């Protein structure tokens, strides 16, 4: 048996820079109310959301990612050619192959960096951060670019009163690099596939696409023959994200608070040691309930980017992080608890030092 040589990278890893991009168009609740029977007061009371950003045709997944990444790379004080790997988390890049990460890596000017996409919903940034940390410590890349990016406006049913107001678009990115001390704690992550139906796409692509081989042959992999959802004019609706709101709320508040506490325990700190809490920006009621359940001290700054950005899934944590630092609500060196959770159901939580 031959001995395989091991490769060793940095002792530890840390976030070195962060960047964000929000589309130019700001969409107030009044626009959402044009197609649903609701009110601005109801939307704010149920979600905390006042506005969200919707991308134009030019603000593609790649374009937004490149803008956010350029800022993160500059913030880290390195050049794009030093990036050894690019990890993109998204559920709204509609081309099955190739991965959008390869286009982003090329257009940024990386030197043939490894590049791939992951799909972990609203926990995607945490998954990407964990992979990046492993690459830096293992030595497969000195610097890793992690991007969370979404165009959820493309997957929003504007006639669905339960979800029409929730989602927004944007991109957030961080550069993860070497460190002599631990600045990214152990990740507490997992999945609960028995709850997969609580957040899902309304119609699988193989049922929606009129010319798919499976549909034309009269079948699907799951044998799904349920009626296709129709819009007010009788047309088959484009697939959208749907969720069981109360079930998701209960799970997020009670189960994810436990996961957040586990991340604190794994990092060897308590809530008193925290400076910042950056949960997935799903809903301000969920955020408030988690703060209460975790009994966070008053000195802890809590990200509330959801008010003006909406739920941007994989992009929400890096976007919120970028805004807190840009506004001075948080500062470089602060200790932050981050937790993402969503469709799958999946989750990932860790403690980090802010760049």
From Swiss-Prot:
Gene3D superfamilies in alphabetical order: 3.40.47.10
Region (ACP-binding) location: 281-285
HAMAP family: FabH (MF_01815)
Record protein name field: Beta-ketoacyl-[acyl-carrier-protein] synthase III 1
EC number assigned by the record: 2.3.1.180
Single Gene Ontology MF annotation: beta-ketoacyl-acyl-carrier-protein synthase III activity
Family: Belongs to the thiolase-like superfamily. FabH family.
Pathway: Lipid metabolism; fatty acid biosynthesis
CDD domains the record matches: KAS_III
Enzyme class of the recorded protein, top EC level: transferase
Alphabetic keyword roster: Acyltransferase, Cytoplasm, Fatty acid biosynthesis, Fatty acid metabolism, Lipid biosynthesis, Lipid metabolism, Multifunctional enzyme, Transferase
Acyltransferase among keywords: yes
